[in-house]
Regions:
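Conserved small-residue-rich beta-alpha loop and adjacent elements
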Residues: 120-152
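N-terminal Rossmann-like NAD(P)+-binding subdomain of aldehyde/semialdehyde dehydrogenases
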Residues: 1-127
Length: 152
């Protein structure tokens, strides 16, 4: 049985403030295969505060630095493909062909983000004006559990 009792905030795994547990079911067997300790509002506030603290430095990074960060992220996710595949098979109960695609998808999304960033222009002419894309702030997202990588 898997027990997930930490979340990632401010560059480290931490125990959530939240105390509620959520059962994970194997859809093929309907058996509980694990539990996840859920985050709560305090954890969300901690994550938002960490993101706000990181924002000034991150917003000053160059396009090449951002591409390098995405490439490191891609390598880390791609290196865990087999672990992702195992989790997809167990947690979704999807056929092998669908599971293989689902396990590859997060790395593919990051690769697509890298490709988009490589050709993205942060300063573009617009008639007599110039449009400059500048970071504005932190955004919070709540994504569906069944396709996190596809919605970020």
């Amino acid at each position: 049985m898997h027990t997930i009792e930490q979340i990632f905030i401010n560059g480290e795994f931490v125990t959530p403030h939240g105390t509620e547990w959520f059962d994970l079911y194997n859809p093929a067997t309907a058996q509980v295969m694990g539990q996840v300790r859920l985050a709560d509002e305090v954890d969300a506030e901690r994550a938002i505060a960490a993101a706000k603290a990181a924002f000034p430095a991150w917003s000053r990074t160059t396009k090449q630095e951002r591409i390098a960060a995405l490439k490191r992220m891609h390598a880390a996710v791609a290196a865990r493909h087999d672990d992702l595949l195992e989790a997809v098979i167990e947690e979704y109960g999807a056929p092998a062909s669908r599971s293989a695609w689902m396990a590859s998808y997060p790395a593919e999304v990051i690769a697509q983000a890298i490709e988009a960033l490589e050709v993205f222009e942060f300063v573009t002419p617009a008639g007599a004006a110039t449009v400059q894309m500048t970071p504005l702030g932190v955004a919070g997202l709540i994504t569906p559990w069944n396709s996190d990588a596809g919605f970020i």
